[in-house]
């Protein structure tokens, strides 16, 4: 738990530098920035959040469920797989979707591992090993490096609105999924 809490507190730029050093320079998942390196780095970034939300969801399952299943003769693994995990599933899925929303808005990790300002169209098979244009990076780029910042302000606002809409949509999906799964589990 201490390690997960520590990882959750690490700034995203540190994850980006780690992704650059480990996935690109050490392992060499691709020759340069790539979607795969960015995805692996973002997966590490959101892992603590998913673990913590899953842990909390499992803890929230009433102890009486476990005791009832064990009392009726179910084994430990059978109880975990058929009683505890299905009851915790709404919380686990909610944590996963909210974590994806966080990953969608992160700029620092993808600056080092995946993003380019403008990308040329690439073949589908080469998608994972090539750099990609990314919305958060383009927003940052337009705000800091464009020559006519005032003239393209509407583009910046549109991109920010799109990013916020994506994150809100992911959160809404998490809420709907949680409600539907909870309703199914209750019967």
Q: What is each model feature region?
A:
Residues 1-19, 52-53, 186-187:
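Cytoplasmic-entry segments and transmembrane alpha-helices of multi-pass inner-membrane transporters
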Residues 110-164:
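Interhelical loop and adjacent transmembrane-helix boundary motif
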